[in-house]
């Protein structure tokens, strides 16, 4: 199968973080490159769908039944889906440059939107993991999220 919609379990998992901020019916997962130079070790979600390189091991038939680490990866990618749906399909291609940093430093009063797209996705992933018992050094408060 080349693509699929989200499973009911994945939608429930996503709702635990995003609520109704994502139109889950519009999201598809593709087991094919987003563009010809799609790196093998990366999933890409610049257009509101998630693309997995066909030679990469990150694909799942249902992320809700995967280990917590893969669920966190899925939540990270769904943050990019939310960005595309909330800010437009050009948001990621225009804001996410090749040297975009994933690591972030929380700054008091700094709004979520002031972090770059990858940092936003990591913030959401870290909150997701922390709420499920994973101990992280500096977990952001859920109140930083705009959804």
Map each language-model feature to its residues.
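Metalloprotease/metallohydrolase-associated module, dominated by Zn2+-dependent proteases
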Residues: 2-28, 38-39, 45-48, 85-147
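Active-site recognition of the HExxH zinc-binding catalytic motif
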Residues: 72-84
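Short pre-active-site segment immediately N-terminal to the catalytic Zn-binding motif
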Residues: 42, 53-75, 112-113
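Short C-terminal domain-edge/linker segments immediately following a structured domain
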Residues: 57-62, 81-85, 104
């Amino acid at each position: 199968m080349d693509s699929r919609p989200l499973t009911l379990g994945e939608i429930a998992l996503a709702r635990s973080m995003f609520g109704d901020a994502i139109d889950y019916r519009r999201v598809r997962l593709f087991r094919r490159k987003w563009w010809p130079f799609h790196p093998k070790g990366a999933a890409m979600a610049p257009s509101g769908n998630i693309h997995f390189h066909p030679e990469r091991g990150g694909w799942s038939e249902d992320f809700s039944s995967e280990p917590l680490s893969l669920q966190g990866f899925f939540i990270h990618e769904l943050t990019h889906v939310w960005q595309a749906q909330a800010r437009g399909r050009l948001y990621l291609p225009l804001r996410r440059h090749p040297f975009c940093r994933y690591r972030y430093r929380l700054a008091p009063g700094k709004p979520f939107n002031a972090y770059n797209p990858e940092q936003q996705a990591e913030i959401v992933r870290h909150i997701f993991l922390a709420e499920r018992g994973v101990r992280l050094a500096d977990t952001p408060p859920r109140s930083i999220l705009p959804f």
